[in-house]
Curated annotation (Swiss-Prot):
Domain HhH: 49-78
Organism field: Zea mays (Maize)
Annotated region (Disordered), positions in chain: 1-21
Signal sequence residues: none
Keywords, in A-Z order: ATP-binding, DNA damage, DNA recombination, DNA repair, DNA-binding, Nucleotide-binding, Nucleus
Listed SMART domains: AAA
A Pfam family of this chain: HHH_5
Function field: Binds to single and double-stranded DNA and exhibits DNA-dependent ATPase activity. Unwinds duplex DNA. Component of the meiotic recombination pathway. Seems to play a role in mediating chromosome homology search, chromosome pairing and synapsis at early stages and probably chromosome crossing-over at later stages in meiosis. Probably is involved in the repair of meiotic double strand breaks (DBSs) and in homologous recombination.
Name used for this protein in its record: DNA repair protein RAD51 homolog A
């Protein structure tokens, strides 16, 4: 068999696997008796997959114009048949988790404490003070996620929401050169959007979902997830509204990770804690966003500065990773191991 025929066969097998395991296009609800017009209403409201419908609360479906209580119940029943949300055995879950892909960070030491790299299907939060390497740690996976699986990649595209205006395509070209990838192809495979306020940032997630149903994405970056909340909401009077808005945004991110299996990486800013000990040990930093941000993140990483371009990453919380530290370096070609 020729190499072209083998590639075609491999692509067909991958496509068949996606059909069997999802995400399922929302149009599949029509086969379960849902009218095409109602499917269009769901799609127009930002629900592009059957999974998205299955994860949506009934009261949210009722807010969609033209969806009555009877229709909502019928839609929920149809979605639950395609995407079962009941119990499964721990052995089945274990088998599914063995198939989870990790995207390399570019540093072997960092990959080691992450047990392979950035995990797909979950949210990884990176926080630290300015110049601690948060944005650089977002740029490198945008390239490495395009690598083949056997090279620590995800064989998919990247999506980047930039709230601070710090995204630099030329850095991606330098990183692509390091990994032997075509620079033009790498840039073409990164979808970029600048977010200007918290509402716009949330709307971009709806657009992201429609893009992910069309093509394979392996990574989604939001840099920073909290920057706009610090400016759009001010004072204690708006604290409750800020936290509610942030909780909905983070929940939408988790839904994208669940629906499409993408690795979601978000950066977070910090605030200095000034107390009596700061006089002797220097100011201590804590991430903003409170408990809502802490609970939304699957894996939480803290960055701090070392000597020169050296940075230290510490695993703060994770359901399966040990609390550990790794040293890495900020280089022109992205995140790399420290050269002793």
């Amino acid at each position: 068999m020729s190499s072209a025929a083998q590639q075609q066969q491999k692509a067909a097998a991958a496509e068949q696997e996606e059909v069997e395991h999802g995400p399922f296009p929302i149009e599949q609800l029509q086969a379960s008796g849902i009218a095409a017009l109602d499917v269009k209403k769901l799609k127009d409201s930002g629900l592009h997959t059957v999974e998205a419908v299955a994860y949506t609360p009934r009261k949210d479906l009722l807010q969609i114009k033209g969806i009555s209580e009877a229709k909502a119940d019928k839609i929920i029943e149809a979605a639950s048949k395609i995407v079962p949300l009941g119990f499964t055995s721990a052995s089945q879950l274990h088998a599914q988790r063995l198939e989870i892909i990790q995207v390399t960070t570019g540093s072997r030491e960092l990959d080691k404490i992450l047990e392979g790299g950035i995990e797909t299907g979950s949210i990884t939060e990176i926080y630290g003070e300015f110049r601690s390497g948060k944005t650089q740690l977002c740029h490198t996976p945008c390239v490495t996620c395009q690598l083949p699986l056997d090279q620590g990649g995800g064989e998919g595209k990247a999506l980047y929401i930039d709230a601070e205006g710090t995204f630099r395509p030329q850095r991606l070209l330098q990183i692509a050169d390091r990994f032997g990838l075509n620079g033009a192809d790498v840039l073409e495979n990164v979808a970029y959007a600048r977010a200007y306020n918290t509402d716009h940032q949330s709307r971009l997630l709806l657009e992201a979902a429609s893009m992910m149903i069309e093509t394979r994405f392996a990574l989604m970056v939001v840099d920073s997830a909290t920057a706009l909340y610090r400016t759009d909401f001010s004072g204690r009077g708006e604290l409750s509204a800020r936290q509610m808005h942030m909780a909905k945004f983070l929940r939408s991110l988790q839904k994208l990770a669940d629906e499409f299996g993408v690795a979601v990486v978000i950066t977070n800013q910090v605030v200095a804690q000034v107390d009596g000990s700061a006089m002797f040990a220097g100011p201590q930093f804590k991430p903003i966003g409170g408990n809502i941000m802490a609970h939304a993140s699957t894996t939480r990483l803290a960055l701090r500065k070392g000597r020169g371009e050296e940075r230290i990453c510490k695993v703060i919380s994770s359901p399966c990773l040990a609390e550990a530290e790794a040293r890495f370096q900020l280089a022109s070609e992205g995140i790399a191991d420290v050269k002793d």
